């Protein structure tokens, strides 16, 4: 891509890191992990004037290595690519490790809603829910999903496409579940109009 196309792609890529920067305080420490070279370049470009630390390595290993931080309470936001079926198992294992090492952390996991990955998603959520209830450091947890299409309508000859997104939250702060459910209901109403 040429320079103008790269600038446009950088603007589109901002995503989670941009949101984290918007809602962070000056005293907060932000760490971003990216392994893929093109995404790493976009991340560095978007964050060049920010006080952030960018790690170029496997996110699951980095997540475990960076915890626990010096602060007592914090947020881990994990939004894997889920390109490989084993990403579901890797993220599950990593989040359980983080929870054991840093039991005061709020852990938020994004996951895609895809027909072709329905079993992997179900297994991931069941394992995390069981861990939160029965693990060495039990905590509250919940999931919230935003369905934007009928799953059956996403089927194509090349497979199925994204029909929504979900978030699984471990150790949520007070009222987060209610707030997220209200926001998802509001977004769904808007999408029905469009």
Predicted regions and their residues:
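Class I S-adenosyl-L-methionine-dependent methyltransferase catalytic core
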Residues: 1-194
């Amino acid at each position: 891509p040429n320079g103008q196309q790269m600038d446009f792609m950088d603007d589109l890529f901002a995503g989670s890191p941009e949101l984290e920067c918007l809602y962070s305080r000056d005293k907060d420490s932000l760490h971003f992990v990216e392994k893929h070279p093109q995404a790493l370049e976009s991340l560095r470009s978007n964050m060049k004037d920010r006080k952030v630390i960018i790690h170029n390595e496997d996110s699951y290993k980095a997540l475990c290595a960076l915890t626990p931080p010096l602060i007592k309470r914090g947020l881990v936001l994990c939004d894997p690519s889920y390109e490989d079926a084993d990403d579901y198992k890797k993220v599950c294992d990593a989040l359980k490790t983080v929870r054991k090492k840093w039991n005061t952390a709020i852990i938020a996991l994004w996951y895609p809603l895809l027909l072709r990955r329905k079993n992997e998603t179900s297994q991931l959520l069941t394992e995390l829910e069981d861990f939160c209830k029965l693990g060495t450091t039990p905590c509250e947890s919940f999931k919230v999903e935003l369905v934007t299409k009928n799953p059956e309508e996403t089927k194509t000859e090349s497979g199925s496409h994204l029909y929504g997104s979900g978030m699984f939250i471990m150790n949520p702060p007070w009222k987060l579940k209610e707030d997220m459910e209200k926001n998802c209901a509001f977004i769904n109403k808007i999408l029905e109009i469009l």
